[in-house]
Amino acid sequence: MTIKANRRYLITPDLQIPLHHPKAVSNLIKMSKHEKFDFVLNVGDELDMTSQSRWVKGTKTEFAETLHDERSIAQDILFDLGTTDIIRSNHTDRLFTTLLKGAPSLLGLPELVFEKFMAYSDLGIRFHKRAYEFERGFFLAHGDEGVMSKHAGITALNLAKKWGNSVVCGHTHRQGATRHQTGLNGRYSTIWGIEAGHLMDMKNKASYLKYASADWNMGF
């Protein structure tokens, strides 16, 4: 890997389109265009894929036929953000899971592979199926690769300790950065766990949240 000095990254949080907060996403796009980052990394869950969820099985939501429109919205937003890299995630895994459980004979179709389904190559986006080392010692992950903590930053830090490298992730919908340092004979090493938060509209769109309440952190 070639490391360039002063390389700047934007980490975009869980959007979960169409449950995203339009104004917050608009502000993120404006900031991305103004700052002209070298790379724009997305931690996954760019789509909520609500109708593919096991929680709506047998309900009218499963038959809503909204996925095409949701995909188009996501493609537009990701393009406007200047997204360069996206990691796999549990919500976008729902496409594969739906096919596996309901129509396994379609699994061989290349157009139903998620990154092709989203036309990411046409958008100039690299899709990563495994944790991606975007800078030496720093990995982009979704956050569901380990055990989730209720404390911001700790899910990422636990992954960092497990992998021996700093980790930036989403999934928890919390924002936080925490570090772990080891040392011996005056030689120290530090790894970071960073969680990116979310940009969902909890009040108006996340109807599954009772009283629109959750210990999450909206922002970027």
PLM regions and their residue ranges:
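Beta-strand-turn-beta hairpins that frame and shape the catalytic cleft
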Residues: M1-L10, Y132-F139
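Short, well-ordered loop/turn elements at secondary-structure boundaries
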Residues: A5, K36, F134-E135, K161-G164
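Core catalytic region of metal-dependent phosphoesterases/phosphodiesterases
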Residues: R8, T12-S121
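Active-site neighborhood of phospho(di)ester-bond hydrolases with catalytic His/Asp-centered motifs
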Residues: I11-P13, F39-D45, D85-N90, L140-G143, ...
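A generic local structural motif
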Residues: S26-I29, S72, D76, R126-Y132, ...
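Alpha-helix C-terminal capping segments
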Residues: I77-G82, F134, N158-K162
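Active-site-proximal loop/helix segment associated with metal-binding centers of metalloenzymes
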Residues: G102-F139, G143, S149-I154, N165, ...
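Conserved beta-sheet core of the metallophosphoesterase superfamily
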Residues: G143-F220
